[in-house]
A protein has these predicted regions:
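Macromolecular interaction modules
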Residues: 1-275
């Protein structure tokens, strides 16, 4: 695996007048500096345009106003990598190059461990190369796990053996990666982290609410991908290939995003004019 950890964030812009400034800063300043760090394997950013927002689902109202998603992949040694990553963030502030402070809100941000990568048979690259491969968009699903038992394991098996392979046949699907939040991987001897390790067989309902995330990488318009999934689901349901996983997970956020093309940042101009 080319990276042992990822940082993922959902971002809301509180003032529509700042979308262009925010994109200029992140795409032309912040991201290039981050990618220069030796421990940063890759980093990308996507926009949840108004039409993507209309095609979204999920139970968490705090994510409903999300405009952007950000992800960085980190190499080992992780401690040194993150030290440099956060040091650059502070230096950027000291240089006067953090204009996003004051108009951004991040309803979701945190570290995840990559679980497994999948690649469509038509795509020639490896799963490790998939995040670096150009796409037209992605689809992100974030779920909160309700439990950590045999039923959950069976749901994960269904995702791995049935659901994700099926989705890779949908229009534009190039591949996928699954992720699990850090609290699922705390060693049982580490009291500083929530007790959600496999060694803790008796009390997985602690206060922690671990997250599971899936990202689909798309070569076609993300809305066309979703339309194809909906059409194929009719036959898949009739054939018993679609399972109800609501007993083991709550889908907090499920949304398509578009790739951000440099200098083409006009998705929210109507909202800006109205404000």
């Amino acid at each position: 695996m080319f990276a042992s950890k990822v940082y993922f964030s959902l971002t809301e812009i509180l003032d529509a007048a700042h979308h262009r400034t925010h994109n200029e800063w992140h795409q032309l300043d912040h991201r290039p500096e981050n990618l220069l760090l030796p421990g940063v394997a890759w980093g990308d950013r996507w926009v949840r345009s108004p039409d993507c927002a209309q095609a979204s689902a999920g139970l968490a109202p705090e994510y409903a106003r999300t405009h952007y998603a950000i992800m960085y992949w980190f190499r080992e040694p992780l401690r040194a990598t993150l030290d440099e990553f956060f040091k650059l963030s502070e230096f950027s502030f000291q240089w006067g190059r953090s204009p996003q402070i004051g108009w951004t809100k991040r309803p979701l941000r945190g570290f995840f461990s990559p679980v497994k990568g999948y690649v469509a048979t038509r795509v020639r690259v490896s799963a490790d190369a998939l995040p670096r491969r150009p796409v037209k968009g992605i689809h992100v699903t974030v779920s909160r796990l309700r439990r950590h038992d045999a039923l959950t394991q069976e749901a994960f098996r269904w995702y791995d053996e049935v659901r994700l392979p099926d989705l890779l046949h949908c229009r534009g699907a190039a591949g996928a990666w699954t992720f699990a939040s850090d609290d699922l991987f705390a060693p049982p001897w580490d009291d500083s982290m929530p007790a959600w390790s496999f060694a803790d067989s008796g009390s997985r309902s602690a206060e922690a609410f671990p997250l599971r995330m899936t990202i689909m990488y798309l070569d076609e318009d993300p809305l066309e991908y979703l339309a194809d999934v909906a059409e194929r689901d009719v036959a898949w349901k009739a054939g018993g290939r679609v399972h109800d996983t609501s007993t083991v997970e709550e889908v907090f956020f499920s949304s398509p995003f578009r790739m951000i093309v440099p200098w083409e940042w006009n998705w929210f101009d109507t909202a800006k004019a109205a404000s």
